[in-house]
From Swiss-Prot:
Residues passing through the membrane, by range: none
Gene that this sequence comes from: rps4
Record protein name field: Small ribosomal subunit protein uS4c
Annotated compartments: Plastid
Record-linked Pfam families: Ribosomal_S4 (PF00163), S4 (PF01479)
Residue ranges of every copy of the S4 RNA-binding domain listed in the record: 89-149
Record has Ribonucleoprotein as a keyword: yes
Purpose of the protein: One of the primary rRNA binding proteins, it binds directly to 16S rRNA where it nucleates assembly of the body of the 30S subunit. With S5 and S12 plays an important role in translational accuracy.
Family note: Belongs to the universal ribosomal protein uS4 family.
RNA-binding is among the record's keywords: yes
Domain of life: Eukaryota
Organism of derivation: Cuscuta reflexa (Southern Asian dodder)
One example of a Gene Ontology biological process annotation: translation
InterPro entries xref list: Ribosomal_uS4, Ribosomal_uS4_bac-type, Ribosomal_uS4_CS, Ribosomal_uS4_N, S4_RNA-bd, S4_RNA-bd_sf
C-alpha cells in the first residue's frame, strides 16, 4: 500500500489530530463528537484505527510500518515502546519535532531535496535512523537556510521534547538521547497496533 496523498482533513475528522500529517485540527466539537457517534466499535476496528493513526501521523506505507513492527518485536523491551522509539528517531520526524519543518511530509521533502546534513554529511533518506549525539543542520546554501528559518518562525515549538535541543541561527538540532515515549505528541495506544499485526499473521 502506498503512502497516503489524499485529503488530510478527512483523516483528522475520522482519527483525531495527527500533527505529523497536518497542523490543522477538527474545526468544531461536533466534528469530534461525530467520531464517537458512529456506533459501537468492534475490537478489530479499534485496533485498526490505532494502526491508522500511527501510519498517517508518521507518513508511512503499510509495508514500512510492518517492517518497523517486526524490528520492534526482535528488540529487548516493550514492543510498543520500541516501535514508537524507532519511528520517533527517523530523520523526517526529528526535523518535524525540532520545528525545522511544519509537518512530516514537509520534512521528507527537505530531506529528499538534499537540504539536510547529519554530522556534516548530506542525508537524503527520510527514514534514516538518527542516534544520540547526531547534529542536524541545513546545507550551507541560502535556500536551505531560508526554508528552515521560515518554518521555525511560522510554527514555533512551545516546548521541545527533552531528547532534542535546537540552537538558534544558524539553526542546529542536537539529539541528546533516545526519546522518552511520554513526550510523543500523539494520543495513541501502541500496544493495540502491535496486537493488530499479531492477529494479521
Amino acid at each position: 500500500m502506498s503512502r497516503y496523498r489524499g485529503p488530510r482533513f478527512k483523516k483528522i475528522r475520522r482519527l483525531g489530530a495527527l500533527p505529523g500529517l497536518t497542523n490543522k485540527r477538527p474545526r468544531t466539537v461536533r466534528d469530534l463528537r461525530n467520531q464517537s457517534r458512529s456506533g459501537k466499535k468492534s475490537h478489530y476496528r479499534i485496533r485498526l484505527e490505532e494502526k491508522q493513526k500511527l501510519r498517517f501521523h508518521y507518513g508511512l506505507t503499510e509495508r514500512q510500518l510492518i517492517s518497523y513492527v517486526r524490528i520492534a518485536r526482535k528488540a529487548k523491551g516493550s514492543t510498543g515502546e520500541v516501535l514508537i522509539q524507532l519511528l520517533e528517531m527517523r530523520l523526517d520526524n526529528i526535523l518535524f519535532r525540532l520545528g525545522m519543518a511544519y509537518t512530516i511530509p514537509a520534512a521528507r521533502q527537505l530531506v529528499n531535496h538534499r537540504h539536510i546534513l547529519v554530522n556534516g554529511h548530506i542525508v537524503d533518506i527520510p527514514s534514516y535512523r538518527c542516534k544520540p549525539r547526531d547534529i542536524i543542520t541545513s546545507k550551507d546554501k541560502p535556500k536551505s537556510g531560508a526554508l528552515i528559518k521560515n518554518s521555525i518562525k511560522a510554527f514555533p515549538r512551545e516546548e521541545l521534547p527533552n531528547h532534542l535541543t535546537l540552537h538558534p541561527a544558524p539553526y542546529k538540532g542536537l539529539i541528546n538521547q533516545i526519546i522518552d515515549t511520554k513526550w510523543v505528541g500523539l494520543k495513541i495506544n501502541e500496544l493495540l497496533v502491535v496486537e493488530y499485526y499479531s492477529r494479521q499473521t
